Amino acid sequence: MCSILGSKIIDISKYGIIFSSLSKNLGISGSTLVIGRKDILSRPKLINPPIVMDWQPYIHLQGPTPTIMSIYMTNMNIKRMIKRGGITYYNSLTFAKSQLFYNFIDNSNDFYINDIPKENRSRTNITFTVKNSIHLSKLFCETAKQHNFIGTQYHPSNPNKGCRISLYNGLELSEVKLFIQFMKTFQNKFNFNDLQNSSLSS
């Protein structure tokens, strides 16, 4: 949920409780956002819940000292988001960025491969491999870093699955276009070298 909060229109009435990190789009690390239905939050406790799941002290302003800096930074960021057009603006921006990226991958002649069904694809975290090769995917990430594009490797929990691009709110459409241009250059250079090697071997 933390990857889409602030970047996608969500009908929160469908949820009893939303429990999410503030990082990614809304703020910085260190705080958690809880959105809960009043009828759920006001229920008497039948058991002793874990402290992290007991929100009554916070509702009644009796909780421990909150992470002031994280909340302050989140407040500043949300004010900026509202000034730029709010959730409607960021919903459209995220959709445009993801569509642009997926269209490029899908039309790369299987050089860049995303094997997730289109109806299940994330608009925020896009994964792919280079020619379905972990070796080439790692080479891509290393080359991207040399060109000042950082954080293109897959999630640290599974680094051998290829590449990952996160299109959070902080990434502008122009920056996505710039990265796609790098991907085109990488692909063209690889295809050229591959063609040269084929010519030499023949």
Can you say where each PLM-predicted feature lies in the sequence?
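Conserved active-site segment immediately N-terminal to the catalytic lysine
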Residues: 11-23
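Short beta-strand-to-loop capping motifs
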Residues: 36, 128-132, 167-169
